[in-house]
A protein has these predicted regions:
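Vicinal oxygen chelate
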Residues: 1, 4-13, 33-34, 44-53, 65-143, 151, ...
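Core segments of cupin and vicinal oxygen chelate
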Residues: 1-2, 9-55, 152-201, 243
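A short, acidic/glycine-rich surface segment
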Residues: 33, 62-67, 130-136, 179-181, ...
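Conserved beta-strand in the GNAT
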Residues: 56-58, 113, 123, 203
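Short beta->alpha connector loops
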Residues: 60-62, 83, 104-105, 129, ...
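Hydrophobic, well-ordered secondary-structure segments
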Residues: 143-146, 160
Length: 258
């Protein structure tokens, strides 16, 4: 199954303040076109990117107000895949519940929402216009791209089996730098579904409560899931964060060669 990361969605409390923050990180783009938006209304989300690729910020609603719809209270990923029908059949065979849009008109996008075994919400969208797994932000004229999405899993192997057996993805091997940080790359604790040879793709990790402490980080990247972005000038970003007195962890080259 060919696939790539189309976008990531992050729940936020204040859309305007969050938009300002992410524009500081990724830059401002005035003209942008958003596709593949079956769940959120415009006034409830902000999209940074173009033609469906990018970052969506959304404000969760009270659960009792969304009727038969679904939402996530943590960040989730949208994957572009070459065939929804194959995935749908695999889900039905395993009796895994999912939500699929019904494509009532020509503008509808065929997509599925499903939870993998650790209950991470996964959005799968079919690409009707030919497939290019190298799709990333610079293809859309952006100055940034999505490097990976990190998914927290209490059973890494169960999650990987889901992505491989149900979605049709292929597991890879973690490529560590010479000066790797203090964390496990045992496939039962950290596994990768790669899009490249530099660890771009989906990372599935078992939460490690000592991760931040052992690596002298201000935060713990193994808990809760997160997106990682590729930008052109990390030094300038660090200077902006310092100026705004925003706390960050300088990870250097601890997990991936580069």
């Amino acid at each position: 199954m060919n696939w790539t990361i189309l976008n990531v969605s992050i729940p936020v409390h204040d859309l305007n303040k969050s938009k300002e923050f992410y524009e500081m990180l990724l830059g401002v783009r005035e003209k942008q076109e958003e596709l593949y938006q079956p769940l959120f209304q415009n006034e409830e989300s902000v999209f940074l990117g173009d033609k469906g690729f990018g970052l969506r910020l959304f404000k969760p609603k009270p659960d009792l107000l969304i009727a038969d719809n679904i939402q996530s209270r943590r960040s989730f990923v949208t994957l572009l895949v070459e065939s929804i029908e194959n995935i749908k059949r695999n889900l039905e065979v395993k009796n895994i519940k999912f939500k699929i849009n019904d494509c009532k008109n020509d503008k509808s996008i065929k997509g599925i929402f499903v939870q993998e075994p650790s209950l991470n919400l996964i959005h799968l969208v079919e690409n009707k216009n030919g497939f290019n797994e190298d799709l990333n932000g610079w293809n859309m004229g952006l100055d940034w791209g999505i490097h990976h999405m990190n998914l927290e899993s209490l059973n890494v192997r169960d999650s990987i089996d889901f992505f491989c057996d149900i979605i049709g993805m292929k597991e890879g091997k973690w490529i560590a730098p010479v000066n790797k940080g203090d964390f496990s790359i045992d496939p039962s604790e950290l596994a990768i579904l790669p899009l490249s040879n530099n660890n771009r793709g989906l990372h599935v990790i078992k939460p490690d409560d000592g991760f931040g402490y052992r690596n002298n980080f201000a935060h713990n990247p193994s808990i809760g899931g997160h997106p990682a972005f590729t930008i052109k000038d990390l030094s300038s970003l660090k200077a902006r964060l310092d100026k705004e007195k925003i706390l960050y962890s300088d990870a250097k080259v601890y997990a991936m060669p580069g």
